[in-house]
Regions:
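Glycine-rich, N-terminal phosphate-binding loop and its surrounding beta-alpha-beta segment
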Residues: 76-94
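C-terminal non-catalytic accessory extensions
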Residues: 421-473
Length: 473
């Protein structure tokens, strides 16, 4: 029997209308709570989400998930209701929320959807003894460090595939409906059970290291103490694993540590100026030609990175994944002789990268935290009857809130707009469509040609076309 005050896991997954959490919208959510041994407790939560009128859903997404815009509109909740139910689950005390690639994707979907609907985008993941985790890098670590007890599928290029549908099938887990959110959640739970049963010490260690403060204890910049690191950024050639050395804290982000990959040639760091390093670091691999890449990587301690003492990666395991231990030790000795690289790398990350500033308020989550007064005002917005939102007399400090509030009303409660607001909203929707529709329709036509022999896919594409046509009219 599960006690209410015991820690639980909440496994979850979104299906979305595109791959960019800042701009794209959720289509489906599934989540289920388990106890610490991954036994399901309570009822699964499965919901669809309605689309806003100023958004064109990706036809590719519809083909992948099989969800049509009509299904989402008919069976879905409005976005404020949808995210409120999700937030209530994620916020239950002592919850560890997790998924598969959830830190980089699903958690971002949660944050942006909370932001658009005036819910604190971050508190659910840390208040009341809560935390977040992600199984993708745990599986990568298991594969590189302790592969016994789990079956590892190969893709067509001969590399291990970490796609959830490939792993689950290879390990005898039913996963006939991949890219259905609930099927993905069940597959993730079963893979968690599998890894924990096969490699309990490894599993429990990385689970205990999901907190920033624990990871902080591993980082020793003064002595340049090497660590074992697993990350998708390290590449599949080394099975996403390497020895790294932390050299400095990021100058403006106190959650990020600047590290050097010891398996790669450190010469560019020693020889190039800060400006040259900056240019090379942000040049695509394929555009470098014969130039050596810069083996520098930021590790964000608040994103549950896989870090462990260097000895965790044994010499034998390193050899198996193609890492030359002696070369790594030589590189470490060389870097320790050049403490001046620390200032150089701090300088490298002090250079402002020229990002296009987005003028779309929906995408401005990371432009800054809201003040306590604005947070309180946003709570009032959420609790106010939609019919009374126009009459709310609150001053906001943050310039994002007013346009967010207008969009919140227009998307979810269009009946509350006065005539002038209706004209403003219609103009906004028209601008969105006119900027995208030509390219969008061309893409849709290409997909119809590509899938002309597949009746099911053609039916989905026709549904998307009809939906977009209804919006445009």
């Amino acid at each position: 029997m599960h006690q209410d005050n015991q820690p639980t896991f909440f496994f979850f997954d979104y299906e979305t209308w595109g791959t960019n959490p800042a701009k794209d919208r959720p289509s489906q959510f599934a989540g289920v709570r388990t106890d610490e041994n991954f036994n399901i407790i309570g009822e699964p939560l499965v919901m669809y989400c309605q689309l806003p009128a100023d958004y064109l859903p990706s036809p590719e997404a519809a083909l992948i998930t099989g969800i049509t815009p009509q299904k989402a509109m008919q069976e879905g909740l409005s976005e404020p209701e949808f995210i409120a139910k999700i937030h209530a689950e994620l916020s239950k005390p002592k919850t560890t929320s997790l998924g598969y690639n959830s830190i980089r994707f699903d958690d971002e979907v949660t944050r942006y959807t909370c932001y658009r609907n005036f819910i604190d985008p971050y508190a659910w993941s840390w208040q009341n003894g809560n935390s977040r985790w992600d199984l993708l890098d745990v599986l990568r670590a298991c594969h590189a460090l302790r592969p016994e007890g789990v079956e590892w599928p190969e893709n067509e290029h001969g590399f291990t595939s970490f796609k959830l549908e490939h792993l689950s099938v290879k390990n005898g887990i039913e996963h006939s409906n991949a890219h259905d959110a609930m099927a993905d959640v069940i597959a993730t739970i079963e893979m968690a059970k599998k890894v924990k049963a096969a490699q309990p010490k490894l599993f429990d260690y990385f689970f205990s290291m999901r907190h920033k403060r624990k990871l902080n204890e591993l980082v020793d910049i003064v002595n340049m103490t090497p660590l074992m690191h697993v990350s998708g950024m390290l590449g599949r050639e080394c099975q996403y694993t390497s020895w790294i050395v932390p050299v400095a804290w990021h100058p403006t982000n106190n959650n990020a540590v600047i590290t050097i990959d010891l398996a790669k040639d450190p010469q560019p760091i020693l020889e190039l100026s800060t400006e040259e390093l900056h240019e090379r670091l942000y040049t695509k691999r394929e555009d470098l030609g014969d130039l050596l890449p810069v083996p520098v990587k930021l590790v964000h301690l608040n994103k549950c990175p896989i870090l462990a003492p260097a000895k965790t990666l044994t010499a034998e395991n390193a050899e198996n994944i193609g890492i030359d231990r002696q070369k790594c030790l030589d590189n470490l000795a060389l870097l320790r002789q050049h403490p001046e690289i620390r200032e150089k790398l701090i300088g490298l990350f002090s250079i402002e990268r020229q990002f296009e500033k987005s003028d779309d308020v929906d995408t401005q989550l990371y432009d800054g935290f809201f003040s306590p007064a604005d947070r309180a005002a946003m709570d009032i917005i959420r609790e106010t009857d939609p019919n009374n939102l126009a009459a709310l007399d609150i001053e906001f400090d943050d310039k994002r809130i007013k346009p967010l509030l207008f969009r919140y009303r227009a998307r979810n409660f269009p009946g509350t707009l006065d005539e002038q607001e209706q004209r403003r909203w219609a103009l906004h929707c028209r601008e969105v469509f006119e900027s995208q529709i030509e390219e969008y329709m061309l893409n849709l036509e290409n997909l119809v040609h590509e899938h002309e022999s597949d009746e099911k896919k053609i039916a989905i594409l026709k549904s998307v076309y009809r939906y977009v046509e209804s919006l445009a009219s």
